[in-house]
Regions:
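Active-site C-terminal subdomain of aminotransferase-like
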Residues: 1-64, 70
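Short loop segments at secondary-structure junctions
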Residues: 1-3, 107-110
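Conserved small-domain helix->loop->beta segment predominantly found in fold-type I
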Residues: 24, 30-34, 53-106
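A generic structural signal for alpha-helix starts
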Residues: 41, 56, 60, 109-113, ...
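Short, flexible turn/loop "capping" segments at secondary-structure junctions
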Residues: 42, 95-97, 127-130
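PLP-dependent enzyme catalytic core of the Aspartate aminotransferase-like
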Residues: 109-110, 117-161
């Protein structure tokens, strides 16, 4: 089944493109979604990104993703055991293959207030209703030290409600 889409020059059948016919003859598949020439200058960052991924390799990124997310999970469990005021639960599955590099943490107590205080302390997280903070230790640019520092900041904020 074809979905509605813009009828662009590069989405038109290559064999008929230069015939300049009034009807759109779509290319099937992903190529059919192209509308026009790609703006070359805005693509430069993508090239750098692709080169970085190629240099590091997906296997290494996946390994670090699993290790750093497990470390963050460990830190959260330790805070939960250590502090009486830590009233949260990790919603994301513990199985590494089911979660990628994100942990969704349900906050029973402080909710949005804790999120706002984390942001004021330089911790970039994501807020979702109801009362969920999403933590994403991206393996390309987050370090294990970043996770440790996050844990220290979180403990401090919970202790000083």
């Amino acid at each position: 089944k074809e979905l509605s889409r813009f009828a662009g020059w590069y989405g038109h059948n290559k064999e008929r493109r230069f015939k300049m016919e009034p009807d759109f003859d779509p290319v099937h598949g992903a190529d059919g979604w192209q509308v026009s020439n790609l703006p070359i200058l805005s693509l430069a960052p993508y090239l750098a990104s692709v080169e970085m991924f190629a240099e590091v390799g997906m296997d290494k990124l996946i390994t670090k993703r699993n290790l750093i997310t497990s470390y963050l999970e460990f830190i959260l469990h330790e805070i939960d055991k250590e502090l009486e005021g830590a009233d949260f639960e990790i919603l994301t599955p513990s199985n590494q293959e089911e979660r990628g590099c994100q942990l969704s943490v349900y906050l029973h107590g402080q909710g949005r207030e804790l999120f706002d205080r984390l942001m004021k302390n330089g911790v970039i997280t994501d807020w979702r209703e109801p009362n969920v903070i999403r933590l994403a230790p991206a393996p390309f640019y987050c370090s294990f030290e970043d996770m440790y520092e996050f844990g220290q900041i979180l403990k401090e904020l919970i202790l000083n409600k």
